[in-house]
Each structure stands twice: as structure tokens, then as C-alpha cells.
Amino acid sequence: MDYNIELYKKDSKNEYRYALGVLSERTLFVIGLNPSTADEQSPDPTIRKVMGFAERNNYTSFVMLNLYPQRSPYPDDLPYEADKDELKKNITIISDLIKSQKEANVLLAWGNNVYSRAYLLESLNLIYKNAIFSNH
């Protein structure tokens, strides 16, 4: 799978990344904890793993999303309180992208760090309600 990013949603300061990838007829949506360093030019180790997984499982593209959009290669550096506006924007973007597909395959991909901040589980709950299991 080539790294030809067509979908790159971020804030103006590049502190928050909401979506990274390509939409196609067979897209794998991956929801991680938070974005690290990947951008539209260069993948990071997580994105390389996602690309390999998607390719091995016959997906033609991927879109990387996250429970919280703040960039940090170290999840422990995330704030203890979420920026509610950023969280809301992130949920809206995720919901819109997933709902835009006739059929959406979603891979949830994070470790125990999901329990480190209450808003991460809150975000998961909102994604579940608004995007994954709502009526298209």
C-alpha cells in the first residue's frame, strides 16, 4: 500500500489531527488513542503498522482517527482535562466520515492507556453512539 494521503484534517497550528488517510470502496477505519507524528507527507510507526494490517486484510485504503485529536508521541503527556471544543469537533469529523461510507469497517486500536484519562472513554462512548451504531 502506497502512502498517498488524500484526507488530512488538522487544526491550523498542527497541534490537533482529526483524520489521515484515503477513502475508497474498501476503507479500513482505525481509531487509535491519539495522533503522533504522521502527516500527509510521512507516516510514523503506527501508520506503517496500520497500512500493513489494511493491506494484509485486503483493504484498498485506511483512515486513521483517534479518540482524542491532540498530537503527542507520548499518551501520558495528554492533558488531564479535554478541550471540549476539540473533542466535539473530533467526534463530528469521525461520525461524518464513517457515515459517508455505505459500509464501514472499524478497527479499535489502543492499549491500556485508554483508562488514563476519563475523556478517552467518554470519546469512545460518543463515537459508538454517533458514528458506529447510529442509523446511516
Model-derived regions, located:
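Active-site and ligand/interface coordination hotspots across diverse enzymes
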Residues: M1-D44, R56
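Glycine/proline-rich loop-helix segments at beta-alpha junctions forming the active-site rim
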Residues: D2, S72, L78-H136
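A general structural motif
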Residues: E25-R26, Y59, K102-N105
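Hydrophobic/aromatic beta-strand patches that form the interior of the parallel beta-sheet core
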Residues: F29-I31, V63-L65, L107, I132
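Short, well-ordered beta-to-alpha junction loops that form the rim of enzyme active sites
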Residues: L33, L67, W110-N112
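Amphipathic coiled-coil/heptad-repeat helices and related helical stalk/stem segments
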Residues: T46-I47, N90
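Short catalytic helix/loop segments, enriched in acidic residues and glycine
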Residues: I47-E55
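Short connector loops at secondary-structure junctions
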Residues: T60-D76
